[in-house]
UniProtKB/Swiss-Prot annotation:
Domain spans labelled RdRp catalytic: 511-624
Subunit structure: Interacts with replication protein 1a.
Entry EC no(s): 2.7.7.48
Domain of life: Viruses
UniProt protein name: RNA-directed RNA polymerase 2a
Top enzyme category: transferase
Biased amino acid composition, Basic and acidic residues: 798-808
Reaction equations catalysed: RNA(n) + a ribonucleoside 5'-triphosphate = RNA(n+1) + diphosphate
Region (Disordered), start-end ranges: 775-830
Sequence similarity: Belongs to the ssRNA positive-strand viruses RNA-directed RNA polymerase family.
MF terms (GO), sorted A to Z: nucleotide binding; RNA binding; RNA-directed RNA polymerase activity
Length: 858
């Protein structure tokens, strides 16, 4: 006896009388379905033969047989089950069923749609009820699993007219990213595609209408991936191999980039023009007028004064170990510049110098921020970051590739330094909280007129060993490349082989500039900044265990300088030499900028590390005080603002293209550097020359309009004469012409010293005349002429005459150098032949001159 099915209503569904059946009712429904399936098999009549071009594969789960009959065997898979079967399952089993039916998509650490136990079971009960209700023959209702997904995502319950129930293939991406394919799940026949937004024809949880993107414009803009595509991929990507130390048998993944050819409307003409010859005295006069305190600056003995004077410093939790200090290795000397531009000598990492640098760079962390709810606010800042800068569609369709290839490239780069696959440490056995510390020997040139009252302090570097960095750097490099591909068109990160400061089709003239100078950027970062980075890394697709691990050993660390014997604990501040320094500084700067300013008001945004520059048509509106009150940064809005970033000015030519020009003031200072090592063949000087030429490759593009822009920007930034900047360009043109012109800027007194002190590397032979021998015999002293081992007597004896000869077979100089030395010796008229006493250097006078470096004059 067939019992009538309960009427479908929301009340019956909620009180349990509809959709939740008793075991007897379940058995009845199953038997009815078996009878209907068997009757369909008995009553089937084949249709007339029709010639079709392609066979159509039918799904075994479908009861509709438009082109063929189903199998005689009726599977139990056809029988639907009620919601009571799922009420008895655990949460894990329900989540597996949720993945099977709804088929959510994982974007970063988010499931779209999110899993809700109550909603999922209600959707199952609703689908069970809808299948029992007689439906209209006009449209075909979806099968059970797809119907559950449709109810859960609140989409259509019926198949489209043009789509069959067993073959629903819809492109889930609204715009293809060249070189990428996106498969969110391994689909079976009869699956329901994700819901599509009717307004923008995109996936519902990827469209701008959804809260994940929030802005329609963010998905409509071009990104980095639109201009650069992956040319080829070889091998298989495995993100876990980076931390598994698998060694050289890993298959590298090569990822090359190729830029789309852009149509050129006009070809810029060649602007190689003859310039006036520049005298070196003119360049020195420019330095004297532009940098008045630099012309007489000489720090040759400044560090000696620091080491020998009284020293007082106030630091907390510092450990000093002065027993096993590493002695400084003496170098072979440096080239001496002709120009005096205020450049300093190299700094030696002594204990006092390191303590002074730590005091300024690492200690005395400012406490400028207010008390805030760190978890809630850090999550809000990270969400604002993704809304302001990230194209959500590109992030969902981009792949995380090239990790293993970056790992092999890193190992190949440092192979000459002794780094090999066998020497890689086990990261789980290493204490990653310990960092090495050192100071930079090269001090950054100072452009302010304060050298007469202030001594520059060197920067510090906090770093891990190469064995540890080699395992983290490839991961962050690949993640940074993915981050670049997902940025909106207006955002530029000038780093790497592709992205640079050159912008075609963008003119910096008639634009408002916004430049934020963040002081004490590294040591001002705290727990708030670390939590922001953790949320952003998880959102970009970094594995959550690695992100958590990386942030844990950045909460508290210990730095130690072995050469100086100094150690100190630090907390959340930025490590200036690890694998995440540039990437971390960039995302922190971008997050702070997006929270203080509305990024939609800017046409271009540049974020290289801790620098930032924005261009807008209208005056920028924002609240820069939040840099201090919220993010604990000492921020200063540069006024007047000029297009200046990374020590470069941005200029636009007549064709509307923007290119970068190094700061002329800093380039002139580099011409007077005292850090070029001496070499006999000038190889180090030539390397500096090639670097100088590469930095000044813009000279061929400098028209009169560009020179006028540079002069104006130079005056606004430094409040100095812009005409001197034009004169500096003439000097650059001369010294980039050839290497011989560049050599005029440096000299070395090493060769002149070698002409005089020729006993440093050869044996000294003393021959005495018969007059001296007869005189010695009178004094009762007998010496043999051929005795080469004895040291000559006191050179200050009255009336002595010695003849010094250097054996030709042991001399390394040429005949020309020998004649020059002899002529130099003969030209000196000295009444008494003397040998410079070794007592002047604090050495016993009985030591031979060749051992103590004394100078013999005849």
């Amino acid at each position: 006896m067939a019992f009538p099915a309960p009427a479908f209503s929301l009340a019956n569904l909620l009180n349990g009388t509809y959709g939740v059946d008793t075991p007897e009712e379940v058995e009845r429904v199953r038997s009815e379905q078996r009878e209907e399936a068997a009757a369909a098999c008995r009553n089937y009549k084949p249709l007339p033969a029709v010639d079709v071009g392609a066979s159509v594969t039918e799904d075994a789960h479908s009861l509709r047989t438009p082109d063929g009959a189903p199998s005689e065997e009726v599977s139990v898979e056809f029988v639907t089950y009620g919601a009571e079967d799922y009420l008895e399952k655990s949460d894990d089993e329900l989540f597996v069923a949720f993945e099977t039916m709804v088929k959510p998509m994982c974007i970063g650490q988010l499931w779209c749609p999110a899993f809700n136990k109550c909603s999922f079971i209600s959707s199952i009960a609703m689908a069970r009820a809808l299948l029992l209700v007689p439906n209209t023959p006009n449209r075909t209702m979806k099968c059970f699993e797809d119907l559950v997904a449709a109810i859960y995502t609140k989409s259509d319950f019926y198949y489209d007219d043009e789509c069959e129930a067993d073959d629903v293939q819809i492109n889930i991406s609204s715009r293809d990213v060249p070189g990428y394919s996106f498969e969110p799940w391994s689909r079976t026949s009869g699956f329901e595609p994700p819901p599509i937004c009717e307004a923008c024809n995109m996936i519902m949880y990827q469209c701008p209408c959804f809260d994940f993107n929030a802005l329609k414009k963010s998905c409509a803009e071009r990104t980095f991936a639109d201009d650069y595509v992956i040319e080829g991929l070889d091998g298989v990507v495995d993100n876990a191999t980076l931390l598994s130390n698998l060694g050289p048998f890993l298959v590298p993944v090569k990822c090359q980039y190729k830029q789309y050819p852009t149509p050129t409307v006009a070809i810029p003409p060649s602007l190689n023009r003859a310039t006036d010859r520049v005298d070196i005295n003119l360049v020195q006069s420019i330095c004297d007028s532009t940098l008045p305190t630099h012309s007489n600056y000489d720090d040759s003995f400044h560090q000696v004064f620091v080491e020998s004077a009284d020293y007082s410093i106030d630091l907390d939790h510092v450990r000093l170990r002065q027993s096993d200090l590493i002695a400084k290795i003496p170098d072979s000397g440096h080239m001496i510049p002709v120009l005096n531009t205020g450049s300093g000598h190299k700094r030696v990492g002594t204990t006092k110098e390191v303590l002074t640098a730590i005091k300024k760079r690492n200690a005395d962390v400012p406490e400028l921020g207010d008390s805030v709810n760190l978890p809630r606010l850090s999550k809000a800042v990270a969400e604002r970051f993704f809304i302001a800068y990230i194209n959500g569609n590109s992030l969902a369709t981009s792949n995380f590739v090239n990790v293993v290839s970056n790992f092999h490239d890193y190992m190949e780069k440092w192979k000459s330094s002794g780094l090999s696959y066998d020497d890689l440490p086990d990261l789980h056995a290493e204490n990653l909280q310990f960092y090495d510390h050192m100071i930079k020997s090269d001090v950054k040139p100072v452009v302010s007129d304060t050298l007469n009252i202030d001594r520059p302090v060197p920067a510090t570097i906090t770093y891990h060993k190469k064995g540890i960095t080699s395992q983290f750097s490839p991961l962050f490099t690949a993640l940074f490349e993915r981050f670049q591909r997902c940025l909106r068109e207006r955002v530029i990160l000038p780093v790497g082989k592709i992205s640079s400061l050159e912008m075609s089709g963008f003119d910096v003239k008639n634009k408002y500039c916004l430049e934020i100078d963040l002081s004490k950027f590294d040591k001002s970062q705290g727990e708030f900044h670390l939590m922001i980075q953790e949320h952003i890394l998880n959102g970009l697709g970094c594995p959550a265990p690695i992100t958590k691990w990386w942030c844990d050993f950045h909460r508290f660390s210990y730095i130690r300088d072995r050469r100086a014997g100094v150690g100190m604990p630090i907390s959340f501040q930025r490590r200036t030499g690890d694998a995440f320094t540039y990437f971390g500084n960039t995302i922190v700067t971008m997050a702070e900028f997006a929270w203080c300013y509305d990024t939609d008001q800017f046409e271009k945004l540049l974020f290289p590390g801790d620098d930032s520059l924005g261009f807008s048509v209208l005056p920028p509106v924002g609240d820069p005080s939040k840099f201090t009150t919220l993010f604990n940064m000492e921020a200063k809005v540069m006024e007047p603002a000029v297009p200046y970033i990374c020590s470069k000015f941005l200029l636009s030519d007549e064709f509307g293209n923007t290119f970068s020009v190094p700061d002329p003031l800093r380039e002139v200072q580099r011409l007077g550097t005292k850090k070029i090592p001496y070499s006999d063949n000038d190889e180090f000087l030539f390397a500096h020359f090639m670097s100088f030429v590469d930095r000044l490759k813009f000279l061929d593009r400098m028209t009169q309009s560009c020179i006028d822009q540079l002069s104006l920007f130079f005056e606004l930034k430094y409040r100095k004469s812009g005409a001197e900047a034009a004169l500096m360009l003439g000097a650059f043109k001369k010294y980039t012409a050839n290497f011989q012109s560049y050599k005029e800027l440096y000299y070395s007194d090493r060769r002149q010293c070698e002409l005089i002190n020729s006993f440093s590397c050869v044996e000294l032979r003393i021959e005495r005349s018969s007059f001296i021998k007869q005189r010695k015999k009178k004094d009762g002293i007998e010496r043999r002429r051929n005795d080469k081992r004895r040291t000559p007597t006191s050179p200050h004896g009255g009336g002595e005459e010695t003849e010094t000869k250097v054996s030709q077979e042991e001399s390394t100089g040429t005949m020309l150098q020998k004649s020059q030395r002899e002529s130099a010796f003969k030209s000196q008229t000295i009444p008494f032949p003397t040998v410079l006493s070794s007592r002047r250097f604090g050495i016993d006078r009985d030591v031979p001159p060749r051992e103590c470096g004394g100078i013999v004059r005849v």
